[in-house]
Curated annotation (Swiss-Prot):
One of its GO terms (biological process) is isopentenyl diphosphate biosynthetic process, methylerythritol 4-phosphate pathway. Catalyzes the conversion of 1-hydroxy-2-methyl-2-(E)-butenyl 4-diphosphate (HMBPP) into a mixture of isopentenyl diphosphate (IPP) and dimethylallyl diphosphate (DMAPP). Acts in the terminal step of the DOXP/MEP pathway for isoprenoid precursor biosynthesis. Pathway: Isoprenoid biosynthesis; dimethylallyl diphosphate biosynthesis; dimethylallyl diphosphate from (2E)-4-hydroxy-3-methylbutenyl diphosphate: step 1/1; Isoprenoid biosynthesis; isopentenyl diphosphate biosynthesis via DXP pathway; isopentenyl diphosphate from 1-deoxy-D-xylulose 5-phosphate: step 6/6. It comes from Idiomarina loihiensis (strain ATCC BAA-735 / DSM 15497 / L2-TR). This is 4-hydroxy-3-methylbut-2-enyl diphosphate reductase. Its EC number is 1.17.7.4.
């Protein structure tokens, strides 16, 4: 059995930054450090941070007064920011800078009274945070997930429309929705480049390359991870069966029966240690040395807040 490794895979710069912010806050200020929502969507990561003293909550009312709170990589609404400010909570913001970029697009449109259409998945925390940047009763913000949603959509002023998207969507599906928007609203404005982040794009490109050669695909990632789910869907769309797994213990040996080439990738919030455990399990079952495909190099990094940066010694 051959093991093919996607490249790139796993942690992106935004996830790295978010985890580092929590780790540094724990080191400097000591537990408990409160985090609104899972800082990234991965059970292993959240469990490790919880063991170190992070307390994960869903709403700010769960955070005691005079405490530190960290906003997750997915971002929060203006209302949540205002609530934290009103309560005097000390905030460290782990929102991915690429999500913040989308927030700024919405804020600019809102100030002008223009309407916004967000392409995204209902209920995802990133979508809730982005929708929550809009604050103008004269306009409006609408959520669509598919061309069918676009067909049913009615807006106030088709001449003053902007679209933006969740950063972790399927590249292909988003292109279909944008095409539908442009067809229905010819004057709609959008970002020069779509809002899907570089890491989402790169990991989907790697799966596209792998799926054409593999018999089955294992995607390391959490059920609530948007970008991990898109990797599984893309593989299946290309005709290669794919399974989303939290870790090696989730692999069913029956999935591999009759297959010579097993591909392994990981979502942007899945650590490499979980990938290594998957490879070890496959090798226990007769897998050969894993072969990593050549892929796009990623050298993007995002800085953490100044108060959390290590101070030079001497």
């Amino acid at each position: 059995m051959q093991i093919l490794l996607a490249n790139p895979r796993g942690f992106c710069a935004g996830v790295d930054r978010a985890i580092t912010i929590v780790e540094r806050a724990l080191e400097i200020f000591e537990p408990p450090i409160y985090v609104r929502h899972e800082v990234v969507h991965n059970k292993y990561v959240v469990s490790k941070l919880r063991e170190a003293g992070a307390v994960f909550v869903e709403e700010l009312h769960e955070v005691p007064d005079d405490q530190i709170v960290i906003f997750s990589a997915h971002g929060v609404s203006q209302a949540v920011r205002q609530e934290a400010k009103d309560r005097g909570l000390r905030v460290f913001d782990a929102t991915c800078p690429l999500v913040t970029k989308v927030h700024m697009e919405v804020t600019r449109a809102s100030r002008k009274g223009h309407e916004c259409i967000l392409i995204g998945h209902a209920g995802h925390p990133e979508v809730e945070g982005t929708m929550g940047q809009y604050n103008n009763d004269e306009g409006g913000i609408y959520l669509v997930e598919s061309p069918e949603d676009v067909a049913k959509l009615e807006v106030k002023d088709p001449g003053n429309l902007h679209y933006m998207s969740q950063t972790t969507l399927s590249v292909d599906d988003t292109a279909d929705v944008i095409d539908a928007l442009r067809q229905k609203f010819p004057d709609i404005n959008g970002p020069r480049k779509d809002d899907i982040c570089y890491a989402t794009q790169n990991r989907q490109d790697a799966v596209r390359e792998l799926a054409s050669d593999a018999d089955v695909m294992l995607v390391v990632g959490a059920r609530n991870s948007s970008n991990s789910n898109r990797l599984r869907e893309l593989s299946e769309k290309m005709g290669t069966p794919a399974y989303l797994i939290d870790d090696a213990s989730c692999i069913d040996k029956a999935w591999l029966e009759g297959h010579e080439k097993v591909a392994v990738t990981a979502g942007a919030s899945a650590p490499e240690v979980l990938v290594k455990e998957v490879i070890a399990k496959l090798q226990e079952w007769g897998g050969k040395t894993a072969v990593e495909l050549s892929g796009r190099e990623e050298n993007i990094t995002f800085s953490i807040p100044p108060e959390l940066r290590p101070h030079p010694v001497g």
